[in-house]
Amino acid sequence: MKFFIKNVLLEEEKSDCIVIGVFEFCEFKYSNNYLNKSICSYINNFIKKGDMQGKVGETLLLYDVPNVVSKRILLVGCGKKNRLNRYYLDKIINKSMKILNKFSIKNIIFSLTEINIENYDIYWSIRTIVNSINKYLYKNFKINAFLKKEVYLNSISFHIIEKKDFHIANNSLKHALAINSGITAAKNLADLPPNICNPLYLSLQAQKLSEKYKDKIHVTSIDIKEMNNLGMNAYVAVGKGSKNKPYMSVIKYSGINNTEQEKIIVLIGKGLTFDSGGISIKPSNNMNEMKYDMCGAAAVYGTLIAAAKLNLPLTIIGILAGCENMPGGNAFRPGDIITTMSGKTVEILNTDAEGRLVLCDVLTYVQRFSPNIVIDIATLTGACVVALGNHFSGLFSNDDQLAYALEKSSRQTNDKIWRLPLSLEYEKELHSNFADLSNVGRGKAGAITASCFLAQFSKKYTWAHLDIAGTAWKSGKNHGATGRPVELLSQFLLNESNFLKF
């Protein structure tokens, strides 16, 4: 798929279809730089007759419009003026793409970038539209590949009216395509079946990044032998029941113009390629979805791809913490006491609370990099899904400034997060009579007590935890990975690197 920015007279541009937005209860008006008066009058006739009312997602396909070189114009309803937001825009793009695909259209021009989207300028309009298009294309290409159907669409252009906006629009498109490459990579990795995507496979995918981006990315793979030597006993314990041994990939991205004084940002992704629950085995219902317990690692993988394509002037260390939690003769048990890499001891009360055991050793391991910021991303708790549902990821942090920066990135991208508390009252729930900590709380607020557990191992640096258990994938009709929070993390890195949109 090719994308372009164009500053041309729409009626003179050749394409299979021009997509134009129409507001509800509004006369269609375009300046001479868009379409001339006779074309606007022609379109207004359909609006006056009631063929197009402008309701969100409503469409009307026009053929052979007088004085227009393109073969078709697709009118798409944008709802009430000044109320068009990202949610509605997503619906509009989805409906438009369905119509375009139905008629085997190969190249299109989107003129929606001139429509006023709530709180968005031209930069964010294009970012948002590209993101919506890629969401549709990802799903559609997968279905067509399965059904062995041809995909026709191969070129999308964005029309802008002001030449002064061309550089901004071009930058936006570059950013959008880089970030969406990361989102797609994360989805592709997460959607793989667990008999293919095991910890070794995850490690090999990381190695391929060093081959593809050899001037920017260096990868080190740490196997179970080295983990044992490092004292990562909690991490190793989780993988003991499986024949697929754990692998941890350390991916170092060194961006352009980075110096010794640059911030070092560490991203840690929980990579449980399958989580049966271990001895504390999960119910069989929906256990197939536990292949998605590595979506944190997939998100880190995708974010590093985006960073490499954006050439961000940062030093980023990504950790893919690959492991598989299975029952077996060597599996760890409820009642076990494990000495973590930090020296703290943990009493195991539930082997299905395994992600925090993997992460606690990784959080200790990354101290060697003297990081300025550490963010871990994990499908950590079902309790977070109960608290926030499937729309918001949970945010926990020991630093208000970092939490604010992540919340800002969330607002910019609409990749929603909600901050939850960390406090001593909740830490008391992790009390053990036999060890420093137990691996689960004894009361309620499971997402918070899990984060309090992680906080015990992240006191030496600025840290945040994203619980993506409710947002990493969708069930039901649209079953599949979402690629979240790659866009949020990529925007956070853009903001940290002061990569201005202009």
Swiss-Prot record:
Its cofactor is Mn(2+). The keyword Cytoplasm applies. Keywords: Aminopeptidase, Cytoplasm, Hydrolase, Manganese, Metal-binding, Protease. PROSITE patterns: CYTOSOL_AP (PS00631). One of its GO terms (molecular function) is metalloaminopeptidase activity. Mn(2+) 1 binds at residues 275, 352, 354. HAMAP family: Cytosol_peptidase_M17 (MF_00181). Belongs to the peptidase M17 family. This is Probable cytosol aminopeptidase. It comes from Buchnera aphidicola subsp. Schizaphis graminum (strain Sg).
